Amino acid sequence: MSGPLEPPRRSALEFFDRQFERQVEARDYGLNPFERAVLPHLSGDVLDLGCGLGNLALEAAGRGCRVTALDSSSTAIADLARRAGARGIALEAHSADLRHYVPARDYDCVVSIGLLMFFACGDARRLLARMREAVRPGGLTAVNVLIEGTTYLDMFDPEACCLFGHDELSEAFSGWEVALSRHEDFPAPSGTLKRFHTLLARNPARP
């Protein structure tokens, strides 16, 4: 971590804290479709940025990955640490504001599912670039974002959100080996729409 981190934006954090509290109460710990797509590709040292309740982090660590899981929600991180301890699974889980986060080292896999769209576009794109830099030669990045065409915006802080361009992730990892590139639409409340792009790309440089 690069140093003292600024307080996170409140509205998105409060939105997800409430959601996480409901999920914990309901014991709703299933992997979402994006996490299920990513999990088989993870190995070695894994950095999970915006891990939420840590369902992916916990499953990856249970399969032998060495996982560092970070999220802005102390509610989510506390529950992840509790569940990992109960299952005897070793992982690192920390609460942090990720807008200006700089990875302290490199990793075999760097994951960000459903995080970057909650930052102003400048912050989101800079973090995406730092994620790319943190992937070891031959390593993998797995990124999932909302893209243009999304009409469900209730969870966003209006001053800090970013809908990525349709192919912006692909362009950001131009020259990398694409393991998966998937555009998907999901219905949302009141007839709105969530439009996602999920990209798994491997650093072509070899160790």
Where is each model-derived feature located?
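Class I (Rossmann-like) S-adenosyl-L-methionine-dependent methyltransferase catalytic domain
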Residues: 1-43, 52-102, 119-126, 140-207
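A short glycine-rich, Lys/Arg-flanked "PGG" loop and its adjoining helix->strand segment in the class I
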Residues: 125-137
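A short acidic, Gly/Pro-enriched loop at the edge of an enzyme's catalytic core
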Residues: 102-110
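A short SAM/SAH-binding and catalytic strip from SAM-dependent methyltransferases
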Residues: 109-123
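Conserved beta-strand/loop positions that form the S-adenosyl-L-methionine
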Residues: 49
